[in-house]
Amino acid sequence: MKRSRLPLSLLAVAMLAGCASVEPGASLNQVRSLTQAHTAPALTVDRSAEDLARTHAKVTELLRQPIGADTAVQIALLNNRGLQARLQQLGITEAEVSQAARLPNPGFSFGRLTQGDEIELERALHVNLARLLTLPLVSRLEERRLQAVQREVAMDVLSLAADARKAWVQAVAARESLRYMHQVQEAAEASAELARRMQQAGNFNALTRLREQGFYADAALGLARAEQRQRAARERLARLLGLWGDQLDFKLPERLPDLPDAPRDQPDIERQALAQRLDVQAARLAAEQTARNLRLTEVTRFVSVFELGLVRNTSNEAPRQTGWEVSLELPLFDWGGARAAKAESLYMQSLHQAAATAINARSEVREAYGNYRASYDIARHHRDEIVPLRKRISEEQLLRYNGMLIGVFELLADARSQVASVNASIEALRDFWLAKADLDMALIGRATLPMPAAAAVSAGGEAGAGH
């Protein structure tokens, strides 16, 4: 009975190891479950030429109509090759986890010895018993690593969706702003041409004419910058959507969506972020995995090589010999202290990283929500106060012009001012939708938040260019 214990224990370990195999495609389903609530379309992985052709046909169909924000996200998740490459990491890690759960291959040795006329043949079959006994623990560690990779890939999916939505907002706003900058340039050109003709007729002095010419030059510069921003925003959107060739002729809506009636009120936003942010979950899993790695290091600290073998010797002059042998590593020079110290430091490092991730998550979501509320208030102020006021001023100026109380130059200058206010309103609406995308991302993962000072300087420069 004692002889049967070792084979039975090895058989039990083998059964446990066989149960630890990973079902192909299970990781993709897990990523889908993590992202489906935040990205409506389901993820697909292109593994063949037929899959690529099917994706291309789907994208072509979606591009027949002007691209909305949700459609842009759908195309990006379907067609972005960088995301497809990242999704392949799931299959790679699944294969590595399955490989780690497999039984170690046994070793075989053969020897031939001669002594006079005697020939002795030695055959041995051995297996790494230390690796076999730690196989369940190693399999659980690999499964934890697979879960971490799943969350990392899910984070990449959500980041791409947020970036595509923000790029769409910027592209539509840049297109709408370019249209108004054309109006500013046309008004400035008409004013400059009228000033030139009136100077030729002797009704204008050189200073007034040069002033109008300066307005026209500034408007032309503002138009060139608007065209540059529009091209850059469109190209960035095309990159994120994975578009090229004939697909670059995609159409966008004429304007951004209207401002919502009221902003979202989220008093428990920090708790919500900590509960559902994937980077916080990944940091927690990393700390747990490091703790299990520390346990494995402690188990194998002194003996990391422990082999059991069966031996069979035959000779032409002696009876056959059978038996077993055990070989193990003697910890004479390396007691495993350095590996244990490294594992402990890695564990403490993972704890600090998890705490830092949670602290940063709280701060990011507070900042994102503050930007969201401030951007909403600014956009609403433009919509309800500044734009109607500029429109009323323009109406009064037109009445004064019809009554010959002001001249055409004052009317054109007021038209430029009104268009500039509308353009500023577009930028405020753009900033709101960008802030909303940042807030949505900050609730589920790392968000790329803008620098308020830089944004303010840029807005001021654009407004000045329009006058």
Regions found by a protein language model. Name each.
Residues 1-75, 227-272, 440-467:
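Terminal intrinsically disordered/low-complexity segments used for targeting and assembly
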Residues 189, 218-245, 353, 358, ...:
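Short segments within alpha-helical structural elements
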Residues 87, 140-143, 206-214, 408-416:
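Short, charged, amphipathic alpha-helical segments
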Residues 205, 361, 368, 404-408:
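Alpha-helical heptad-repeat coiled-coil segments that mediate oligomerization/polymerization in large
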Residues 20-43, 74-131, 234-243, 270-338, ...:
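A small-residue-enriched
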Residues 20, 135-137, 151-272, 368-371, ...:
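Periplasmic alpha-helical coiled-coil/stalk elements that build and connect Gram-negative outer-membrane
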Residues 126-133, 137-143:
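Short, Lys/Arg-rich amphipathic alpha-helical interaction segments
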